[in-house]
Amino acid sequence: MSDKLIIFDTTLRDGEQSPGASMTKEEKIRIAKQLERLKVDVIEAGFAASSNGDFEAIRAIAQSVKDSRICSLARANDRDISRAAEALKPAGQFRIHTFIATSALHMEKKLRMTPDQVYEQARLAVRFARQFTDDIEFSPEDGSRSDMDFLCRVLEGVIAEGATTINLPDTVGYAVPEGYAALIRSVRERIPNSDKAIWSVHCHNDLGMAVANSLAAVKLGGARQIECTINGLGERAGNTSLEEVVMAVKTRRDYFNLDVGVDTTQIVPASKLVSQITGFVVQPNKAVVGANAFAHASGIHQDGVLKARDTYEIMRAEDVGWTANKIVLGKLSGRNAFKQRLQELGIELDSEAELNAAFTRFKELADQKAEIFDEDIVAIVSNEAQHAEGEHFRFVSLSQRSETGERPHARIVFVADGKEVTGEAEGNGPVDATLNAIESKVASGAEQLLYSVNAITTGTQAQGEVTVRLSKSGRIVNGVGTDPDIVAASAKAYLAALNKLQDKSSEKLNPQI
């Protein structure tokens, strides 16, 4: 059996299904390039048939990423598979991931198909997909709750048709480690041609066991691919956390005896990028990528670490990409120094125009705060990346008046569909007044579900990172804005969220795998 563990990242597909985590095409490309630097084996870039926006994002990623294999999800029908193949065509190497439900409940209530019909459709789908690529993954949706005999029949059939990866998902996060590993092992033992495919696992974290289930399936069940997301991003309680499974296998190689090709020094940069783009803040005590993951408050622990790091640290912070905050640039730094630092941070801008816009914003920030950190530079690029072609709203300027005992007043200037407009309003505070001023001109009718503020670096001069979550007509989106002025950051975040609400191309199907 292979001693290589394949890391299949689905941040851009299953991760994006987390309410509010929708991303623009440009944001997806940035994450895909970071995943390539992370050296993940497979990037599931989306679900091509679900929307034109997803199709275009997959195609753009297929054109941009060269070293990782690009994958698209597709239901088990010719239309979906053809659409996936078309989007993936620019990629040097690609995979089609097709699926159909196999549990009695799903077949009867959702598909309204008999087991024989599902069996036949699964086989035909894999056969059709083989016309486009030799790399086919098949998932029996709700496989962990399917009848064992029928599940084995379907999987044997799709392997015979050419499926090269079989993924057994725990769709609702119900499994426990020993039981899930036993399921994988039992299915593999019962299927005569099981050695013709790589066995994969895809776990959800509803009971907090996604990582444990995945690792048990690898160690005890013989799985050799784990499907996961950066920061465990995903709907409900999330998916298997990439950083946790990778570091578990690498740190405990004595136990797992498996190789992983991931460049672990890119884990924290990937975590920060996904967090900034989605607005989902990483909890401080999150394993590997949380702010406190390598912090020691106990005096005894601190003393031990100072004498010998391995007394209380099983991993080194620098091995996963943690670096100390350090001043890298200032107001006298030139364009070439800025460009070089972007390259050192692994940030690629597609054009001179994008570089010029980011540099202009950097100079503006340097006039506002004396010390510029790497985190500030990443935030600048993230902020500029939101200004995609065809955006509806863009922040221009803000003025406010607030005195004790009086209602604050805000006046904001922003671009709406190419035209500069000015809104004025009062509110319960400066932020409320500013958002009311935007709504006085936009009248979006959206409901605000969340408002949060996070400091990007330390100190009173730190940039504030604001996340605003809006809901309208069943759609939930996040907007993120950064600025040393928290109120200005709030306005930018609100406008970013409104832009996503206006983007109809992001409306799509969200399959449960």
From Swiss-Prot:
Domain of life: Bacteria
Gene3D superfamilies, A to Z: 1.10.238.260, 3.30.160.270, Aldolase class I
Ranges in a coiled coil: none
Domain Pyruvate carboxyltransferase: 5-268
GO CC annotations on file: cytosol
Database matches in InterPro entries: 2-IPM_HCS-like (IPR050073), 2-isopropylmalate_synth_dimer (IPR013709), AIPM/Hcit_synth_CS (IPR002034), Aldolase_TIM (IPR013785), LeuA/HCS_post-cat (IPR054691), LeuA_allosteric_dom_sf (IPR036230), LeuA_bact_synth (IPR005671), PYR_CT (IPR000891)
GO molecular function ontology, one term from the record: 2-isopropylmalate synthase activity
Reactions that this protein is recorded to catalyse: 3-methyl-2-oxobutanoate + acetyl-CoA + H2O = (2S)-2-isopropylmalate + CoA + H(+)
Function: Catalyzes the condensation of the acetyl group of acetyl-CoA with 3-methyl-2-oxobutanoate (2-ketoisovalerate) to form 3-carboxy-3-hydroxy-4-methylpentanoate (2-isopropylmalate).
Family per similarity comment: Belongs to the alpha-IPM synthase/homocitrate synthase family. LeuA type 1 subfamily.
Protein's name in the database: 2-isopropylmalate synthase
Gene that this sequence comes from: leuA
